[in-house]
């Protein structure tokens, strides 16, 4: 019909009838929330698969990550023992208040949908407030992302993961002080101290990922993902860390679950058409474009870029043609 999959309709109706239904449906079940500008759906799919090796899981695997979609997922998974939920950045504070999550996964923050969310420091402050409001919550945070590091910097229970930060244009200053951020190959720090005199610097990670495998506090394991791209290796590292540290999932089972994901709501899927193999990639902001273009197979016969904004195509086509 062209009207979408309808994943939020039930939640919209239920939320209108009972404004407190999210908390009621949550029922105190152990929950993990996954948030960030890019990688939410992929990380949630990997994490849900890992937690599912030990528990029954309810999740919004269609990417419906606002209130209505979350409520729909909770209604569909009423018999599940655990909740693994992708949550829009601006919805995290009240979703956390409703579900009191056991774990919060913080991926990255960059410019996205400025007409809706405004400047990203607003999101950083909102997420930081959610962390402060739930001091017992385990936070799995990307220490390579300056903004997410600020969100989790004062958390009492935090695991730092070196998941990478491909796009740096939105984190040239400290979100708390405005001080310039200096970067080296494997470190960053703000030249201006925090209000209490502490240095704001990249924390030392206990989890990480490189081209060969995933690094844990006790071991290094191979990591052979079906999904392309450096960013997805970082997503996998955070998903695996959350499953192991947050829910006691066996490390090897968590890795296998992440490796088994080859399609996320159509993203990264491969289509065979008229004798050709077509790989679909999605990008919706500058950071996503940078990552998607890095995944392009330079030996491919062709590259097609499609946009849902008609005003973009005429302006962009000559530049793309010139770059061929």
Task: Name what the model sees in each region.
Residues 264, 282-324:
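Active-site beta-alpha connecting loops in nucleotide-dependent enzymes
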Residues 33-54, 98, 254-268, 287-296:
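Short, compositionally biased "basic patch" segments
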Residues 47, 51, 70-74, 236-246, ...:
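Buried hydrophobic packing segments
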Residues 1-160, 167, 173:
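Phosphate-binding loop of NTP-binding sites
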Residues 157-287:
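Adenine nucleotide phosphate-binding catalytic loops in nucleotide-utilizing enzymes
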Residues 8, 29, 42, 65, ...:
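Conserved active-site and cofactor/substrate-binding residues in soluble primary-metabolism enzymes
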Residues 36-37, 62, 163, 256, ...:
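Cofactor-binding loop segments of dinucleotide-utilizing enzymes, especially the Rossmann-like FAD-
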